[in-house]
């Protein structure tokens, strides 16, 4: 359970790739990022591959259109890093990952998150040679991106409640029996974020290390526990999946996940005020209007949540156990707008 990706912390790390990466190589990144980094690469580069969509059929087309490459560099947020994993998996080439913000744990996970008919699926297998965390590069990202990464750790708060509830109500999956050891390991990563909330808010070197080390643990935890998601993901992620399904638009991953943590902790009656206070200390944006959503969007996602859980084949959580009625929707709206 302790195998984690090699992670290198430093400065000026992107400029070094041309000195050692296998040639020819491709950089998977985003259109808005590429102009900033284009001069860091040399004529051994045959890209870039600019990510347009995570719909699997489109990712497949993009990968098929690539020329021969001997390495891939993921440079960006979750979509760029997941696309790089997909390329490494399909082409069987070495992978190097460079997250440009602390927005998600994608750099530290083996599978790529793609969409199939609007439903999230985790596919493939790719382990990077290393993940490169450049302090100055991370700090140059918008603060809302860097703070949002706590969502992938704060979700342990609701996930652990869901797992215990499933055990106690006889709804626990046979393949994922409750394991206090896994919960305790996750708690270490969770507590690190809570204890360093102010440093993460400030994106100090200390804060970058604290959040990235927790994301490093969490990203690998799915595989390291035998493909068990129970200690790292629960109903809070299902809220995000339902929002994505309904709206058909991308999000900064940790923002809707954090909203899901608050909503589902309220449904669980699981210290919602306390976990909200932690989110506020970090400064993560979780209100719908900060994500370009309306409360009508959130309400619609909550209403279809049990149905979406069933459609997507997700596990038993508070979203299946407790009804979400109009009174709950109105009450949580008032609470989060206060």
Tell me what each language-model feature is.
Residues 1-71:
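ATP/NTP phosphate-donor binding region
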Residues 19-20, 64-67, 121-126, 130, ...:
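Solvent-exposed alpha-helices and their adjacent loops that cap or buttress functional pockets
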Residues 34-36, 79-86, 104-107, 232:
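Short glycine/serine/threonine-rich phosphate/pyrophosphate-binding segments
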Residues 66-87, 91-102:
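A short, small-residue-rich loop immediately preceding and capping a beta-strand
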Residues 91-189:
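A glycine/threonine-rich phosphate-anchoring loop and its flanking beta-alpha core
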Residues 153, 162, 166, 170-172, ...:
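C-terminal charged capping/lid subdomain of soluble metabolic enzymes
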Residues 180-289, 293:
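Active-site segments that bind and position negatively charged phosphate/pyrophosphate groups
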């Amino acid at each position: 359970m302790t195998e984690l990706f090699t992670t290198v912390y430093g400065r000026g790390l992107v400029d070094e790739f041309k000195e050692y990466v296998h040639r020819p190589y491709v950089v998977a990144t985003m259109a808005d990022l590429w102009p900033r980094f284009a001069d860091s690469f040399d004529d051994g580069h045959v890209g870039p591959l600019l990510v347009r969509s995570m719909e699997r059929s489109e990712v497949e087309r993009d990968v098929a259109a690539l020329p021969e490459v001997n390495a891939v560099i993921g440079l960006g947020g979750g979509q760029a890093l997941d696309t790089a994993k997909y390329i490494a998996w399909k082409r069987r080439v070495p992978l190097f990952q460079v997250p440009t913000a602390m927005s998600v744990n994608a750099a530290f996970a083996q599978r790529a998150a793609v969409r199939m008919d609007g439903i999230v699926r985790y596919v493939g297998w790719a382990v990077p040679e290393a993940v490169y965390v450049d302090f100055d590069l991370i700090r140059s990202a918008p603060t809302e991106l860097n703070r949002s990464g706590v969502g992938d750790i704060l979700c342990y708060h609701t996930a652990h409640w869901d797992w215990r509830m499933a055990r106690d109500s006889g709804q626990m999956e046979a393949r994922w029996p409750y394991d206090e050891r896994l919960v305790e390991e996750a708690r270490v990563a969770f507590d690190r974020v809570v204890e360093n909330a102010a440093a993460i808010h400030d994106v100090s070197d200390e804060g970058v290390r604290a959040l990235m080390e927790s994301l490093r643990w969490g990203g690998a935890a799915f595989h390291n526990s035998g493909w068990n998601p129970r200690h790292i993901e629960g109903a809070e992620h299902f809220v995000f999946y339902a929002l994505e399904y309904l709206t058909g638009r991308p999000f900064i991953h940790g923002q809707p996940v954090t909203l899901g943590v608050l909503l589902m902790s309220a449904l669980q009656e699981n210290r919602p005020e306390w976990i909200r206070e932690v989110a506020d200390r970090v400064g993560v944006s979780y209100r719908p209007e900060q994500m370009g959503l309306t409360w009508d969007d959130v309400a619609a996602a909550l209403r279809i949540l049990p149905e979406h859980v069933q459609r997507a084949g997700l596990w038993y959580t508070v979203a299946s156990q407790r009804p979400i009625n109009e009174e709950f929707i109105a009450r949580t709206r008032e609470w989060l707008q206060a």
